[in-house]
Amino acid sequence: MKEHEITRQAREHFQKTINTMSDQLSTVRASRVSPAILEPVTVEYEGAKYKLSELAMVVAQDARTLIIEPWDVSMIPAISRSLQKANVGANPSDDGKRIKLVFPSLSQERREELARLVDKYLEEARIALRNIRREYIDEVKSKEKKKELSEDESRRIQNELQKAFEEYEKQMEQICQRKRKEIMEE
């Protein structure tokens, strides 16, 4: 039997929640430093604010080093100031052409702190998923009361919504489990 339109819409919302959580997780540093850790950094340059990615190319040189190559070397002081303000966990150093960020190895305490942050993001996403599910189930019940849906159809859609919820919740848990494992690796 074909999935109901309401369930399809709920799945889209569930997927957006997972995407948001994944974006949050990409900013959490694991054992390997990733350019995504600098996504939230904004740079004030010539009176305007820019995302770092709009002003420079960011690449991982190795597991602990990021290289930032600005499109224009005159931006280096502004980018360095922004990196220091953003408190990304490494002090910028430049050679006049590019900025280098060398991150220290993560202590066990810091790893545990980051794992707790991953758990926090997972719980926020779970709450969002539950709210989405509740919203759509309420919509189905409302349509049933208005006689737009039969009782059987309503029950079938609610079961579809529950199955979709469980499927997306499991996906989120797997994503977070991988991130936790990545963080705890030496």
From Swiss-Prot:
Entry's Gene Ontology molecular function annotations: ribosomal large subunit binding
Main location: cytoplasm
Keyword set, alphabetical order: Cytoplasm, Protein biosynthesis
Mitochondrion recorded as keyword: no
PANTHER family: MITOCHONDRIAL RIBOSOME RECYCLING FACTOR PSEUDO 1, RIBOSOME RECYCLING FACTOR
The protein's role, per its UniProt record: Responsible for the release of ribosomes from messenger RNA at the termination of protein biosynthesis. May increase the efficiency of translation by recycling ribosomes from one round of translation to another.
Protein name from the UniProt record: Ribosome-recycling factor
Organism: Coprothermobacter proteolyticus (strain ATCC 35245 / DSM 5265 / OCM 4 / BT)
Gene: frr
